[in-house]
Amino acid sequence: MAIPESIKNKRPTQFGAAEVRSIGGHYYVYLVRSKWDAVKGRPQKVTGKSIGKITEADGFIPNANGLRLMQEMRITPDVAPKVRNYGAYEMLCQLNPDLDGQLKEFFPDTFREIRTISLLRLVDGISSAKMVQPAFLDSYMSDLCGDIAMSESSVRRFIAKLGTMQDRIDEFMKADVMPGTTLMFDGTSIFLRSEDSLSAKGYNPHHNQNPQARILYVFEKDSHRPVFYRVVQGSIVDKAAFLETVRATGCEDCIIIADKGFYSKRNVSALLNAGLKFILPLQDNTVNVPEEFYRDQDDGKWDDVFTYNKRPVWYWKHPSGNKGNFIYTFRDDFRKAELEGHFIESAEKGYGEEEQKPADVRKEIRMGYFSFCSNLDVDPREIYLSYKQRWDIEQCFDYLKNSVSTSASHAHTDEYFRGWAFLNHVSLLYYYGLLNALRQTKLDGKYSAEDVLKLTKNIYQVDTGDGQGPKVSAIQKKTQGILDQLGIDLLRKI
């Protein structure tokens, strides 16, 4: 296709030799150079990277390659181009339109600082006060909120002050907890320095005895939205932490879905005495399921079977004790085959501390089995599906959960740590806005939330100082397709 003269006239000349190509109805600019071809005895054209695109309305719009060149070359003699990370920030704001209003309602004087640091935390992985200002100045947030103080000392003071506002933080979170909802809990251990008063010796799921605090997180089952959290000492027993956190949410008639390791007779009694409904996963070596049940290879031992994702899941339900509790046991044959395959492969390659033979897999009679204790007398499929949603949450939570420890290591006081915990919570709210949008548009099968964040981080807002205002850098076709499906318009404010 011939390139229109109006497009050719907008070809940038400051980069040296460049040519315009028509691809898919759009006009892209590529760097070109010549290289001597000794075989042909003449110069040969070599096409380099694309540096942007040209439109009739906006002229040349640089992409990431073009922006780097512009910064290196200082295109204008007096004013360097102003480049801001834009795409991911604007996308997250558009996907969470109500969050601004909620923050403004409960934190009218500081909601912009909370929003800004939380977004920097999510998009750029910021985990300490000293890294906030550099990321802020490079981001679109510095244009939105250019008057807020983001120096290291200012950020430290702000976070510590935020940590003293726990009552207001709780009210903000309680507004998200609906009566009669099903709540899922996730407890993560946070390692701190030994001098921090919040930290105390206590076992975490990895059996370390380092100084630690625990953040007990509460998620709403159906939306997967994080709605509440509580910071507790590592030495406080889970029973006390659970009951205190449930009371703090203000939720009535809730169903508690806990993480593995919480089950014990004492904890069950505490939940029953508090009048709470619960679903508690049991350890693989639980005594609540008879050994002979695992050894019995006859599928007639099961009550029935249902399908999940086109694979069979067998179940057995039986009463436990005299207080209305039930044990629900399931076997996922797909998971069983997967675990057996891993065991055999490890044995063949000699992995592991103990020497094992592939045929030893026959001794692993509990593979693919998992059980729960609950005081709900319901169809076993409901128990399975409820906890399956919790597994999904665990996978998603890992994105921020893995970096919480880094944030905590910079906490010099209890108030500072609590302030970071709340900023992390707001980051999670933005993250789940993206996650739920991917689910609703059926894009989650192709792209994770992390994938989309990485793609949109490469979209910039550029002001070359030509008096025509900022422009959005070129957007890859794949990325634009994702944004269109999510209903995101990155040009709406430009």
Language model features: what each stretch is:
Residues 1-184, 189-194, 217-230, 243, ...:
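Dynamic "connector" segments at or just before major functional cores
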Residues 112, 147, 151, 181, ...:
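Secondary-structure capping and boundary motifs in well-ordered enzyme cores
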Residues 211, 230-231, 274-386, 454-494:
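An anionic, glycine-rich sequence signature occurring as long contiguous blocks
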Residues 138-162, 398, 402-472:
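Extended, well-ordered alpha-helical scaffold/bundle regions in very large, multi-domain proteins
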Residues 132, 382-411:
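Short amphipathic alpha-helical "interface-anchor" segments enriched in bulky aromatics
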Residues 257-266, 284-287, 416:
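Acidic, metal-coordinating catalytic cores used for nucleic-acid/nucleotide bond scission
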Residues 230-251:
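Active-site beta-loop-alpha junctions of metal-dependent nucleic acid enzymes
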Residues 129, 171-233, 330-332, 336-359, ...:
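Active-site cores of enzymes that catalyze phosphoryl transfer or operate on phosphate-rich substrates
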